[in-house]
Amino acid sequence: MSHNQNQPHRPVPVHVTNAEPNPNPNNLPNFLLSVRLKYVKLGYHYLISNALYILLLPLLAATIANLSSFTINDLSLLYNTLRFHFLSATLATALLISLSTAYFTTRPRRVFLLDFSCYKPDPSLICTRETFMDRSQRVGIFTEDNLAFQQKILERSGLGQKTYFPEALLRVPPNPCMEEARKEAETVMFGAIDAVLEKTGVKPKDIGILVVNCSLFNPTPSLSAMIVNKYKLRGNILSYNLGGMGCSAGLISIDLAKQMLQVQPNSYALVVSTENITLNWYLGNDRSMLLSNCIFRMGGAAVLLSNRSSDRSRSKYQLIHTVRTHKGADDNAFGCVYQREDNNAEETGKIGVSLSKNLMAIAGEALKTNITTLGPLVLPMSEQLLFFATLVARKVFKVKKIKPYIPDFKLAFEHFCIHAGGRAVLDEIEKNLDLSEWHMEPSRMTLNRFGNTSSSSLWYELAYSEAKGRIKRGDRTWQIAFGSGFKCNSAVWKALRTIDPMDEKTNPWIDEIDDFPVQVPRITPITSS
């Protein structure tokens, strides 16, 4: 993988080779052989993107030339004209002021990301692939065939040797109970919140909005109530607890916080994303439910948002867009990730999350719908024109030989944070969006180092890019997440400043970032103990 931190978007010189005699009687080089198509496309992109400036230059030149010919008499005549129309000028000025005031008071409030923090568990909670298989075998519930099935999944998952499991499941025998689940939730959430409050200097009493998402663990009192109690948040806080919304719920929480910040002036919003493993380790033999055991790991993140204009100078990012897609009206999409009791004849009643075989196809449809909505908001005009021209050629003129045009999102974003749901998901998105290994590196390394941490994985990926020193002022980052329902959600962030890795003391990658990226084999054999 490339360590180059600058994207390869600059044109390169055209080289023409004359090794063979040129059959062209005019001695002109065959540019079809010498010009790479992607650079022609890049030049077209630059031309269309700057078309407005090119068109305005002659108008500006003509205006300057006209103004330069103004004399004192011309200015005197203009003054006299305005003086005799004083009332009209006054009304026009008042109207302009009124319209400006209306615009500034009704426009959406800008939402800034002050900082975020990802929880890094204690080294004692590291779960190697061998440890996972050992604990699975010691439980005494899984059949030999299903133990072999889990080992096969794990060997191909892309997970490394330093992912984390909760203490209750590492014990022999394991102790999955409500008390241990609460302990895991508190450890992860409070650890992430402590770090983000310390980094930003924001006091708990200043937080006016709290949004917590955890899909499978929803105790009473809620997780959000646990945070209010721990940090003694104020009594009129707007508190929300989102459950059952899958791995995409982190961006749903961001969108909800954004909506609340539009109507709550001068407020801070704390968003906490996590998942609980302790009570959701499936102890049965339904294979559709065993995949979750193999890839989900312990983790969480806390994000602090603000709509205060004074916070812009110290914020890292500005939230530009959020786009949410819900395919739940389709029965197949609704049931492709489904929590239920297993149907094993020998051991019924074990609850797990079943993943259907058509999950990838459904995720692809959800992604297509999402980017169709997002594209016009972020893509440069050059890409939109190419897409429209291709669509007209295929649909209107019935030119079937032309393939559907996939917009180049690398022209809209410098960084991609794709939910580390599994190797197959990342492979498909890399292929469909034509992304490079460099673009996919944060997602693949997060999957390798931390596993699938559900909704918080996007923040481990952004933290990776920060630790690598990749985030520069003005850079745009696209976060994409998938979740049960079935949902696909996107968030677009713009960096307000260059992130210096040396300032990121609590970044979960910072003490080992030089060890990455690592080569992840397609199959990593697990050595038996």
UniProtKB/Swiss-Prot annotation:
The keyword Transmembrane applies. This is 3-ketoacyl-CoA synthase 20. One of its GO terms (cellular component) is membrane. Inhibited by K3 herbicides such as alachlor, allidochlor, anilofos, cafenstrole, fentrazamide and flufenacet. Strongly inhibited by metazachlor and only slightly by mefluidide. It catalyses: a very-long-chain acyl-CoA + malonyl-CoA + H(+) = a very-long-chain 3-oxoacyl-CoA + CO2 + CoA. Disruption phenotype: No visible phenotype, but reduced root growth. Kcs2 and kcs20 double mutants have a glossy green appearance due to a significant reduction of the amount of epicuticular wax crystals on the stems and siliques, a significant reduction of C22 and C24 VLCFA derivatives in aliphatic suberin and a roots growth retardation and abnormal lamellation of the suberin layer in the endodermis. Residues 103-396 form the FAE domain. It comes from Arabidopsis thaliana. GO terms for molecular function: fatty acid elongase activity. PANTHER family: 3-KETOACYL-COA SYNTHASE.
